[in-house]
Amino acid sequence: MRERETVFDRIGEEDQVIAFFPCIRFENQIMLSFRGQAYQMRKWTDVQKMEHDMKLLDELNHMYKLVNKLFIVCIRKKIKLIVENPYSEEHFLRRYWCLQPSVIDKDRRERGDYYKKPTQYWFVNRKPSYNFIFETANDNAIPSRGKDAWKERRKADYELTGAETVKVARSMIHPDYANRFIREFII
């Protein structure tokens, strides 16, 4: 018997949860840290790198348990769930998880977002709608500046997203993209 109420106790089969699950330990750049090849680690000793690896692995394990618990609860309670996370071949969930994404959006600019940002979505207890949207998507893309686009991003570029830093700008979703995604896959 559970000791306390959870947020899931008030969510039922008629509800729908959309989760932007933290990706910091699942995304492909984390592999650079595990190998000790991240730029900020260039002067670290092997011992420092290994100690850091153990911490990263603990954090990865914690996040992996959380995402699994979220899915398990929603599957058992028949709660409709949509989870968003970045997509890449090296992404931890893409490589090692038993669930495959329902939708992979390889270029979000085609649906009106600021950046390409390949993204994967898991749909639980429901299927994507795959509605056909007749109007063309607005071109809200912020111009790329080559291979190291994020390093060369100018303040004027990322301020278009409403963000105050380039780090926050990467997480911003253009309202046109959100609207189009909802109409195409959810409604």
Spans of model-derived segments:
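Conserved active-site and SAM-binding loop architecture
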Residues: M1-I187
